[in-house]
Protein backbone atom coordinates (compact mmCIF):
# COMPACT_ATOMS: atom_id res chain seq x y z
CA UNK A 1 0.00 0.00 0.00
CA UNK A 2 1.26 3.40 -0.82
CA UNK A 3 -0.05 5.19 2.21
CA UNK A 4 2.65 7.83 1.88
CA UNK A 5 1.60 8.69 -1.66
CA UNK A 6 -2.14 8.18 -1.15
CA UNK A 7 -2.89 11.37 0.73
CA UNK A 8 -6.55 10.43 1.05
CA UNK A 9 -5.44 8.14 3.93
CA UNK A 10 -3.82 11.00 5.86
CA UNK A 11 -5.24 13.62 8.19
CA UNK A 12 -4.43 17.32 8.07
CA UNK A 13 -1.27 16.66 10.13
CA UNK A 14 0.08 14.15 7.63
CA UNK A 15 -0.62 11.20 9.92
CA UNK A 16 -1.56 8.02 8.09
CA UNK A 17 -4.70 6.08 9.02
CA UNK A 18 -2.77 2.80 9.02
CA UNK A 19 -0.36 4.19 11.64
CA UNK A 20 -3.33 5.32 13.73
CA UNK A 21 -4.68 1.76 13.60
CA UNK A 22 -1.34 0.38 14.80
CA UNK A 23 -1.34 2.73 17.80
CA UNK A 24 -4.99 2.41 18.81
CA UNK A 25 -6.01 -1.19 18.17
CA UNK A 26 -4.87 -4.48 19.62
CA UNK A 27 -2.93 -7.05 17.68
CA UNK A 28 -6.05 -9.22 17.41
CA UNK A 29 -8.15 -6.34 16.09
CA UNK A 30 -5.53 -5.44 13.50
CA UNK A 31 -5.11 -9.07 12.42
CA UNK A 32 -8.88 -9.33 11.97
CA UNK A 33 -9.01 -6.06 10.03
CA UNK A 34 -6.22 -7.04 7.64
CA UNK A 35 -7.67 -10.54 7.17
CA UNK A 36 -11.10 -9.14 6.28
CA UNK A 37 -9.56 -6.65 3.85
CA UNK A 38 -7.65 -9.44 2.08
CA UNK A 39 -10.87 -11.44 1.78
CA UNK A 40 -12.90 -8.44 0.61
CA UNK A 41 -10.53 -7.66 -2.25
CA UNK A 42 -10.09 -11.31 -3.24
CA UNK A 43 -13.85 -11.82 -3.43
CA UNK A 44 -14.55 -8.64 -5.39
CA UNK A 45 -11.56 -8.91 -7.76
CA UNK A 46 -12.80 -8.41 -11.30
CA UNK A 47 -16.40 -7.78 -10.22
CA UNK A 48 -16.54 -4.08 -9.31
CA UNK A 49 -17.31 -1.83 -12.23
CA UNK A 50 -14.35 0.34 -13.10
CA UNK A 51 -11.89 -1.72 -11.04
CA UNK A 52 -9.67 -4.29 -12.69
CA UNK A 53 -9.06 -7.78 -11.35
CA UNK A 54 -5.35 -6.96 -10.99
CA UNK A 55 -6.01 -3.77 -9.03
CA UNK A 56 -8.16 -5.58 -6.46
CA UNK A 57 -5.80 -8.55 -6.29
CA UNK A 58 -2.92 -6.15 -5.65
CA UNK A 59 -4.91 -4.53 -2.85
CA UNK A 60 -5.44 -8.00 -1.35
CA UNK A 61 -1.69 -8.62 -1.65
CA UNK A 62 -0.96 -5.30 0.06
CA UNK A 63 -3.17 -6.18 3.03
CA UNK A 64 -1.70 -9.70 3.16
CA UNK A 65 1.72 -8.08 3.35
CA UNK A 66 0.55 -5.84 6.18
CA UNK A 67 -0.75 -8.90 8.05
CA UNK A 68 2.50 -10.80 7.50
CA UNK A 69 4.48 -7.80 8.75
CA UNK A 70 2.22 -7.47 11.79
CA UNK A 71 2.74 -11.12 12.69
CA UNK A 72 6.48 -10.94 12.13
CA UNK A 73 6.87 -7.64 14.02
CA UNK A 74 5.11 -9.19 17.00
CA UNK A 75 7.55 -12.11 16.84
CA UNK A 76 4.79 -14.62 16.29
CA UNK A 77 4.75 -17.31 13.64
CA UNK A 78 6.51 -16.08 10.53
CA UNK A 79 4.09 -15.82 7.65
CA UNK A 80 4.75 -14.74 4.13
CA UNK A 81 2.33 -12.84 1.96
CA UNK A 82 1.90 -16.05 -0.06
CA UNK A 83 0.96 -18.01 3.09
CA UNK A 84 -1.75 -15.49 3.91
CA UNK A 85 -3.00 -15.26 0.33
CA UNK A 86 -3.30 -19.05 0.19
CA UNK A 87 -5.25 -19.16 3.43
CA UNK A 88 -7.48 -16.28 2.35
CA UNK A 89 -8.08 -17.85 -1.06
CA UNK A 90 -9.35 -21.01 0.68
CA UNK A 91 -11.89 -18.91 2.58
CA UNK A 92 -12.83 -16.92 -0.54
CA UNK A 93 -13.39 -20.19 -2.41
CA UNK A 94 -15.48 -21.46 0.48
CA UNK A 95 -17.54 -18.25 0.36
CA UNK A 96 -18.19 -18.71 -3.37
CA UNK A 97 -19.98 -21.97 -2.57
CA UNK A 98 -21.96 -20.63 0.40
CA UNK A 99 -25.71 -20.24 -0.16
CA UNK A 100 -26.52 -18.55 3.14
CA UNK A 101 -27.30 -21.64 5.16
CA UNK A 102 -26.88 -21.45 8.92
CA UNK A 103 -25.19 -24.32 10.72
CA UNK A 104 -26.07 -26.62 7.86
CA UNK A 105 -23.40 -25.71 5.37
CA UNK A 106 -23.68 -27.51 2.05
CA UNK A 107 -21.24 -26.97 -0.73
CA UNK A 108 -19.31 -28.82 -3.33
CA UNK A 109 -16.55 -29.23 -0.75
CA UNK A 110 -16.44 -32.57 1.00
CA UNK A 111 -16.78 -32.66 4.77
CA UNK A 112 -13.09 -33.50 4.95
CA UNK A 113 -12.19 -30.42 2.88
CA UNK A 114 -14.36 -28.18 5.04
CA UNK A 115 -12.80 -29.65 8.17
CA UNK A 116 -9.32 -29.03 6.73
CA UNK A 117 -10.21 -25.39 5.95
CA UNK A 118 -11.62 -24.94 9.45
CA UNK A 119 -8.52 -26.48 11.03
CA UNK A 120 -6.23 -24.33 8.89
CA UNK A 121 -8.18 -21.24 9.89
CA UNK A 122 -7.99 -22.09 13.60
CA UNK A 123 -4.26 -22.77 13.37
CA UNK A 124 -3.76 -19.52 11.50
CA UNK A 125 -5.71 -17.47 14.05
CA UNK A 126 -3.89 -19.08 16.99
CA UNK A 127 -0.50 -18.41 15.42
CA UNK A 128 -1.24 -14.92 14.18
Curated annotation (Swiss-Prot):
The keyword Membrane does not apply. Transmembrane segments: none annotated. This is SaV protein. Coiled coil: none annotated. It comes from the Viruses. It holds the Pfam family DUF3310. Belongs to the skunalikevirus SaV protein family.
Amino acid sequence: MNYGTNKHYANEYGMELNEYFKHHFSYEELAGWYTMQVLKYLVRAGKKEGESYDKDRNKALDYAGELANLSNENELTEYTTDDIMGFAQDIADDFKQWKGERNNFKSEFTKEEIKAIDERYLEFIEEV
